[in-house]
Amino acid sequence: MMHPTIDIKTFLKPGVRAHLAGIGGVSMCPLAEVLLGMGLIVQGSDMTESDTVCQLRAQGIDVAIGHSAENLKDCDLVIRTAAIHDENPEIAGAIARGIPVYERAQAWGAIMQHYENAVCFSGTHGKTTTTSMATHIFMAAQADPTVMIGGTLPMLHAGYRVGKGDTIILESCEYCNSFLNFFPTVAVILNVGEDHLDFFKDLKDIEHSFHAFADLVPQRGYVISNADDQGAREAVAGLSHPVFTFSLADRTADCYARDVAFFDGCASFDVMIHGQLYAHVDLHIPGKHNILNALAAASAAYVLGIPGQAVTRGLEDFHGAGRRFEHKGSYHGAAVYDDYAHH
């Protein structure tokens, strides 16, 4: 794999022509829209027609179906998904012509530097749900965030939105160390466990990656971590940066849940921060783990000055993300759920 010698930030200006290989992907489509909003001329390719492709074309983005070096035209740079390798005709063509090729994560990392607040949710489990919760909270606060989620959020009818506020919220994946291309001002670690062992050597290697991710946060920013998770505790151990912690019941944590009660499997509780009531939450998704997810989202809101009322309202309206224990209906009296369940 060739690594461009020119910083991708050099290209993020009006009039530059960017080609996105795999433009219909879940995190490439919002990337295309953000780049378009920055004044770049955006084009791309994908293997199949889709609603996403039609949506991009409706905004004036030229999308070719199928991959060919001819699709590059006179582009200035190429951005690709992790699934597209050097042997792809567009990537090979770009390399042959000396056109710089960047990874999707590099592009997002450069973009987030244009925002005052870059809130990155990481972890082995719960990223999509917690990023979705945070989106609801920041929307309730009328912060108008830009959002990138690795799943569909019913409120958005998509996995992303392009806002005009000073905050960007991203689901941040550790696979291939992609989140190390990011520039978080708020780095949230939900949990750390064994996963992606086709890339990482072992759990210690994964913890080291999360430690490096947290270490990216500037001194003005915040590292938020799950005090109840051993892997997360190991990941933030030894950081020079202070760590804001959340916990289900540990009252020595910065943020914890009080007076937890369950109704039909869904939790109701108070969010306590530094011993003071910050917000009351009534969840509409089941499971104790979602209390922790809500505490993580609330912690991110708190450190950025979002009022507790927005946490209450935002989570009151949250009924889950697509394919995350998503209730689809019933069949002969049995409840039917759709869950990604890829671990």
What name fits each language-model region?
Residues D76-T81, E116-F121, G163-K164, D254-S268:
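Short, surface-exposed amphipathic charged segments that create phosphate/polyanion-binding patches used
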Residues H3-H19, S27, L31-M38, Y115, ...:
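Nucleotide phosphate-binding/pyrophosphate-handling subdomain across enzymes
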Residues M1-E103, A107, Y222, Y256-R258, ...:
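N-terminal leader/targeting and accessory segments in enzymes
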Residues K9, V34-G37, R57, N71, ...:
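Phosphate-binding loop of NTP-binding sites
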Residues S45-D46, A64-H67, E103-G109, M148-G151, ...:
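Beta-strand->loop->alpha-helix junctions that form or flank phosphate-binding loops
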Residues H19, H67, H125-G126, H196, ...:
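Histidine-centered active-site/metal-ligand motif
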Residues T52, K73, I111, M155-L156, ...:
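Generic structural signal for helix capping and beta-alpha/helix-loop junctions
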